[in-house]
Amino acid sequence: MRRLRLFETVRMTAAGIAVAGALGVALAGGAFAEPTPPSIAVIDPGAKADTVAEPDSYRTDEYRKPVPATLKGAKVVSAEEASALWSNGSAVFIDVYPHAPKPPNLPAGTVWREPQHFSIENAKWLANVGYGVLSAETENYLKRHLERLSGGDKAKPLLFFCLRNCWMSWNTAKRALSYGYTNVLWFAEGTDAWQEIGQPIAELKPEP
C-alpha cells in the first residue's frame, strides 16, 4: 500500500493543452462535452460549500469550484464514514477523475507515457463520466459499468468521489440517481480528505 501525496502529470499535447496536478489538477473550461482534456483553473478560496446552491441540472463548466453541501436524493459521507464503508466492503467506490487520452498525431518518435493515477485502494475508475455533457458512447459506458458494479441491484450502495471541490463527482452521483439507483453516496471531499485521515491509496487504471 502506498501512502503518498497524489501527484500526476499529463504530457503537454501538440495543441498546447496541459493537465497537471497533485490530484489537485484543475478541472475547468467552457461548456464542452468530454473527452476534451480539462484546463487549468484556480479554485475560488472565498466561496464556501454551504453558500453554493444545488443547480437544477449538471455542472458544465468550471469543475474545480466549491460544490454544494448536499445532493438531493443522495447521502453525503465524510472521510470517516467513507473509511468505514471501505473497511467493511459495503459500498462500491467509484472514482470519476478524468483521464487524458493519448494525443493524436504525435510527431514521429514521440514516446507517450501514460500518466499515473493514484486513488483510493480497490476503487473502480470510471474516467470522463463526470462532465456536464456526455457523448452517447460515454453515457453507455457509465450505465454499463454501474449495472456491472451493482450486480443489477439498484439498491446497491455506490459511492462516488473525485477530489475536494470537484463537480465531476457531484454530476456523476446525480446521474446515477437519474438512472434509478437508490443508495447513492457522495464523498465530496474525495481523495484529499482520504489521505488526510491516513487511508491507503494505490495506482488505478481506467475500467475498459
Where are these regions (language model features)?
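Rhodanese-like catalytic fold shared by cysteine-dependent sulfurtransferases
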Residues: R2-A15, V19, V25-V76, L85-N88, ...
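Short hydrophobic beta-strand that contains or immediately precedes a catalytic carboxylate
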Residues: A82, S90-Y97
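Surface-exposed acidic loop/strand-edge motifs in secreted or periplasmic proteins
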Residues: V96-A100, N105
